[in-house]
A protein has these predicted regions:
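Histidine-rich, glycine-flanked metal-binding segment
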Residues: 1-4, 9-53, 67
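Divalent metal-coordination and catalytic microenvironments
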Residues: 8, 26, 47, 58, ...
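Metal-associated gating/positioning segment near the N- to mid-region
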Residues: 45-117
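Histidine/acidic-residue-rich, glycine-tolerant segments that coordinate divalent metal ions
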Residues: 97-108, 113-198
């Protein structure tokens, strides 16, 4: 598919000007004034600002939460449609490892949730709920084979997403060795649970 956007206002770090933008197979291939190219679709962007789509790096679609059957309200269809209406063209969601199971099982589940439903592009971080020493090689494989280079760990929500200090240390050490990224949900979940129960 090819797209020609005519007469749009383009703002860069150093310029502010009007031009045409030619897109082939979802890649911008030409920017210039009065482009003369054949395109399957043409959009007149006169008096309009042309900006790239936004990226939402933190979504939770169909996230199960706890034993009561609570699930976040948006699925991949409603969530990505809403994102597209707001100008977001990529989301990054969080497959959630079940305790005692492989991160690859979580990834497969999340791909199935997204399959055929997404209105926009998506990628993944990985929520880790436990990680024994023997499964640490999964982290390198996630990065190399699946492009997942960021992991989220929770210090909150005991019995749901909370990771113990051993898991926290093992995953942080491995991430440091391989140059991947850790996202922390940093609260004292044990103390919060005590306060809520008192």
């Amino acid at each position: 598919m090819s797209l020609l956007i005519k007469n749009g206002r383009i703002v860069t770090a150093v310029d502010d000007y009007y031009a045409d933008i030619f897109v082939e197979k979802e890649i911008v291939t030409l920017i210039g004034k009065n482009l003369s190219v054949n395109a399957e679709t043409m959009v007149d962007a006169s008096n309009r600002l042309v900006i790239p789509g936004g990226i939402d790096p933190h979504t939770h679609f169909e996230l199960p939460f706890g034993k009561e059957g609570i699930v976040s309200s948006d699925d991949f269809e409603t969530g990505t449609r809403a994102a597209a209406f707001g100008g977001t063209t990529t989301i990054i969601d969080f497959p959630t490892q079940e305790k005692g199971h492989s991160t690859f099982a979580a990834l497969e589940t999340w791909h199935k949730k997204a399959e055929g439903k997404c209105a926009i592009d998506y990628g993944f971080h990985m929520i880790i709920t436990d990680m024994e020493e023997a499964r640490l090689p999964e982290l390198r494989k996630l990065a190399d084979d699946e492009g997942i280079t960021s992991y989220k760990l929770f210090m909150a929500y005991p019995d749901v997403l909370y990771v113990d200090d051993g898991t926290l240390f093992r995953v942080m050490r491995k991430a440091g060795e391989q140059g991947t990224v850790i996202c922390m949900h940093a609260e004292n979940g044990i103390v919060i649970a005590e306060i809520l129960n008192s």
